[in-house]
From Swiss-Prot:
Superkingdom per UniProt: Bacteria
Cellular component, GO annotation: cytosol
Cited HAMAP family: UPF0301 (MF_00758)
Protein family according to the UniProt entry: Belongs to the UPF0301 (AlgH) family.
Protein name according to UniProt: UPF0301 protein RHOS4_26140
S-S bridge residues: none
A family per Pfam: DUF179
InterPro entries on file: AlgH-like
Length: 184
């Protein structure tokens, strides 16, 4: 099972409070483990413009402003830009299922600061990581629902509504979603 490009939707029974009502886009998944970015938990006290200022990256008057999210509990000082596939930095951009790109170099920050770069993007500080078999076990334990990731929802500005919106997109009423599940 390769979940690359899939969206993990935290179940109401999620035991880890860091992932409560989280949506995680899986960027890489292999027998060695998985890596993903939470796409609906904005960092409240840091704007993209503020981050550019901290990094001494000049922002043009037409510079883009993207949302900064907490991508997960791992390496929170490291930044990743999840973006539409219309931007590629040779040797630095990882394509995720053809619908997304992920770039973790200063080039994309500079492009966005100049008003260039991908048509859609969000910044993530840190990432979510799983060791070999760990994510599969969490899915089997019903910690997560999995679904194809709609790019319009991933890049939506409605961070508080993304979790509910994704469930509705799947035809699930969040009010009737049980916090326990069984196996047939």
């Amino acid at each position: 099972m390769d979940l690359s490009g899939s969206l993990l939707i935290a179940m109401p029974s999620m035991a880890d409070p860091r992932f409560e009502r989280s949506l995680v886009l899986i960027c890489a998944h292999s027998p060695d483990g998985a890596m993903g970015l939470v796409v609906n938990k904005p960092v409240e006290d840091l704007s993209f413009a503020g981050m550019l200022e901290q990094l001494n990256i000049p922002r043009a008057p037409n510079g883009r402003d993207i949302r900064v999210h907490l991508g997960g509990p791992m390496e929170r000082g490291r930044g990743f830009v999840l973006h539409s596939p219309d931007y590629m930095s040779v040797g630095a951009t990882m394509l995720v299922s053809g619908k997304f790109g992920m770039t973790a170099t200063v080039d994309i920050l500079e492009a966005l600061a100049r008003g260039q770069g991908p048509s859609s993007a969000l910044m993530a500080l840190g990432y979510s990581g799983w060791g070999p078999g760990q994510l599969e076990a969490e899915v089997q334990r019903n910690d997560w629902l999995t679904a194809e990731a709609p790019s319009e929802l991933v890049f939506s500005d409605d961070d508080p509504g993304k979790w509910t919106g994704m469930l509705r997109h799947m035809g699930i009423d969040p009010l009737t979603l049980s916090s326990t599940a069984g196996h047939a």
